[in-house]
């Protein structure tokens, strides 16, 4: 596999088009790298001598030291000239954030860049992108001001996006949702480095446990499918594909120069490559959040335990709509629970502990379900507004979770008052969702990937691959 480490963890970076003009692209890139990147940083600007208290050079060729990676942020007509200079300098990788290429019909400009890339062996991300944010190495070429977006905590989810704006949005949104991110890559027109190259690289990245894709169109379909099929056996891959409609496909073409194609073809390609398709970005990260925990079921049977009967019924509906089945509880499990529970408790699946359930009742029910052979994972519904549940109940659930090798998903619906309860569950390593539909999406992602891994031996049904809710 091609080495792309110089993009994610370079020893030195040159910013061509660096600036100290507040609000400019070159300013924001320099500001972010100055604050985050621990390596050597070299501003390149033909007019300015000092930028961010660093000596600025008129050309990358004037820099006395070796440069591993460069970011180009200048007008499109001049990009090929500075790329040539990068080649002469021995730069390994270049991120071209500049727009003005095939997305506006200027394909000849891209052809020239590719010619230079092949001549010197330079790898290119872009053009028409915002580049890389790596939460571990400090690489941050995102030219969005930290005054306007928040950055997420460290996590194990990698996000690859053709759209730069969407990549920036994801950084801000995942921060708000308390979802940890490893890295975000915006690759734009992908004249060189594409989705397949990035999948191959991230497959061996210790900080990537889930890969999320935002795709507008794929050019080298067979190469992409081969990489995805290989990588998905090790790391779950989730994809959000836009351009489903004629209007969307037309918009994608003018946005990143993508050839969208019939959506049904992408649907089939994703299924063959074991990629889990999402319908929207909320769904994308709902599934990623569960998969990041790296605990996968050994059975496709799902158990529901609840103190709110209606939510249990809705969750059962949502699971079936996703092609999942409710676990068949064993006779021993049912007998044991009936002996310990009051008569009003419904001992079946869903298991309705009824509205006066306390932490002891949840503990008995959860332990029994975890011991049942047909139960692969459990959706724990907690109506935390009832007086019988408190923060102690959360501690009980977390204690049981730590002693089990079966995944547990939390459904906790409500408003601000229960937020501390849900936050504590998340901090304890559980994926938490506010509705039956979103909890079901997480369950289906876990079962889907367990089938791909070979942990569950069953055929992948047509509706195991695309969420139907």
Features from the language model and the residues they span:
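Catalytic-core regions of core metabolic enzymes
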Residues: 1-469
């Amino acid at each position: 596999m091609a080495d792309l480490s110089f993009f994610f963890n370079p020893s030195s970076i040159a910013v061509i088009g660096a600036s100290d003009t507040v609000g400019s692209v070159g300013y924001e890139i320099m500001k972010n790298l100055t604050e985050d990147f621990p390596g050597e940083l070299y501003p390149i600007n033909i007019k300015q001598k000092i930028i961010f208290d660093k000596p600025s050079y008129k050309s990358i060729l004037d820099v006395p030291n070796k440069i591993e990676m460069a970011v180009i942020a200048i007008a499109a007509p001049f990009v090929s000239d500075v790329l040539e200079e990068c080649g002469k300098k021995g730069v390994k990788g270049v991120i071209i954030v500049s727009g003005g290429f095939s997305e506006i019909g200027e394909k000849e400009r891209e052809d020239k860049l590719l010619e230079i890339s092949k001549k010197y062996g330079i790898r290119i991300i872009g053009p028409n992108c915002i580049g890389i944010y790596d939460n571990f190495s400090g690489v941050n070429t995102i030219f969005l001001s930290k005054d306007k977006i928040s950055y997420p905590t460290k996590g194990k989810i990698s996000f690859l996006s053709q759209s730069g704006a969407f990549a920036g949005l994801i950084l801000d949104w995942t921060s708000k949702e308390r979802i940890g991110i490893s890295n975000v890559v915006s690759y734009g027109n992908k004249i060189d480095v594409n989705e397949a190259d990035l999948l191959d690289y991230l497959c061996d990245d210790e900080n990537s446990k889930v890969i999320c894709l935002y795709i507008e169109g794929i050019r080298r379909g067979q190469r992409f499918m081969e990489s995805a099929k290989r990588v998905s056996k090790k790391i779950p891959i989730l994809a959000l594909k836009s351009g489903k409609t004629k209007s969307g496909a037309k918009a994608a073409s003018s946005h990143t120069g993508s050839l969208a194609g019939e959506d049904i073809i992408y649907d089939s390609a994703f299924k063959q490559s074991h990629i889990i398709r999402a319908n929207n970005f909320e769904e994308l990260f709902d599934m990623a959040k569960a998969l990041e925990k790296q605990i996968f079921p050994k059975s496709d049977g799902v158990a529901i335990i609840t103190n709110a009967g209606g939510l249990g019924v809705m969750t059962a509906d949502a699971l079936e709509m996703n092609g999942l089945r409710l676990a068949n509880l064993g006779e021993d499990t049912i007998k044991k629970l009936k002996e310990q529970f009051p008569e009003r408790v419904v001992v079946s699946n869903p298991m309705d502990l009824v509205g006066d359930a306390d932490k002891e009742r949840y503990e008995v029910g959860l332990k029994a379900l975890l011991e049942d052979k047909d139960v692969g994972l459990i959706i724990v519904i907690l109506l935390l507004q009832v007086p019988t549940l408190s923060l102690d109940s959360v501690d009980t659930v977390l204690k049981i979770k730590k002693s089990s090798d079966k995944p547990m998903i939390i459904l906790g619906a409500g408003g601000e008052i229960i937020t501390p309860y849900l936050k504590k569950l998340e901090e304890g390593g559980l994926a938490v969702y506010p509705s039956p539909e979103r909890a079901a999406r997480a369950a289906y992602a876990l079962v889907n990937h367990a089938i791909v891994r070979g942990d569950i031996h069953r055929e992948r049904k047509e509706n195991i691959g695309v969420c139907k809710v």
